[in-house]
Amino acid sequence: MKNYDKKITLLPRGINDLLEKKSFQDSFLSQTLMNSFKLNGYEKVNPPMIEFEENYTLFLDTTNKQNIFRIVDPISNKPMYIRNDITPQIARIAANKLYKTTDKVIRLSYIGDVLRPIGSQLHPERQIKQAGIELYDAPNVSGAVEVISTGIQALTEIEISNLIIDITMPNLANLIMDNAKLSGQLIQSAKSYLKVKNINKIKTIPTCGKILSKIADSAGENERALSKLNLIDLPPKAKKLIKDISLICDKIKILHPNVKITIDPIENRGFNYYSGIGFAIFSSNVKRELGFGGEYTLNLNGKKHNGMGLSILFDGLLRATQIKDNQKRVFIPYKHKTSILAELRKNGWITIISHNKKALNKEEAKIYNCSHILNGTKIEEL
């Protein structure tokens, strides 16, 4: 290949083509996930790839405004963003629905690409397909159980096994620090220690360092973690959160006894707008997070609505899946009866038509990965 040819075929770092095998897997995963969401009552919506930046923070308390592509709309001269997360868009759509209705739980699903200027350690790709569900105005415990269970069902449908649910409490450390009335500077120091889970440094935090270190040390298998957390003297709001987590774990175990549950009470990376309950989904078969979600607040005309969501990222799925295209492929020689092709396709055959005038070219059939060849009106296995 000439140097000129090499230059024009380069793609930006973290931006990739999906070739035949991965493209098939991507389509299969998309269709199967969305069908599973639909069967659980989630209705699909399709927000645009780009919209006004002001919409991004209108309904959620906190969003990731740093890692985002920005442009200016040449028509309105207003700043716009290329989405790096679809959840804020679903929050916008849900807000319109909640404004028009009362006493109704809203279930929405979505799928689409997101684009990020910089990849992360967990997700180095910059263009990723994201699929997910959002549940609004359901009680937090039953809502969390429904969303997590729906995610487990969907991933099981696409043959991802050995699932692990890692439950976190993004707001737990904040509850402890607020109760201790720490200064802003001490809170920032504490958050930096918690982020890297430096137990010795956490212990040095005045007033609440001992409690925070015990919370950090409780991480692990859910029964062990909950047992340790229940021994800690926590403020009422924190105790209520621990009780809710315990109920969620019990219900998930009943619904999905083969799924492992762990608890990491101080983990909050990637849970920007989540509060209360958060979770991530892993498989022991792949070293990458498959999905994440949790509880958040939707602000609408001064009223707060409870949201519970799940986002599944395809970079991890495409590494985890072993799905193959097993659809039958039949090689059609140059001279054939055209009337038979429609019937073959109707019966699920992929037809590969030869442009080679040779009568029965079995070698050519193998090149196109055909398992069968058409001989007259009969299909013969190669």
For every predicted segment, state its role.
Residues 139, 143, 166, 173, ...:
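Cap/lid and interdomain-hinge subdomains that line or gate substrate/regulatory clefts
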Residues 47-65, 168-178, 267-276:
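Beta-rich nucleic-acid/ligand-interaction surfaces
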Residues 2, 28-40, 52, 87-99, ...:
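Positively charged, Gly/Ser-enriched RNA/tRNA-binding surfaces
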Residues 67-75, 181-205:
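Acidic, His- and aromatic-enriched active-site or binding-groove loops in soluble protein domains
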Residues 1-88, 145:
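TRNA-binding/sensing appendages of the translation machinery
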Residues 150-158, 171-180:
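Hydrophobic mid-domain F-helix/FG-region of cytochrome P450s
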Residues 162-173, 190, 261-268:
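Short, surface-exposed recognition loops or helix-turn segments adjacent to catalytic cores
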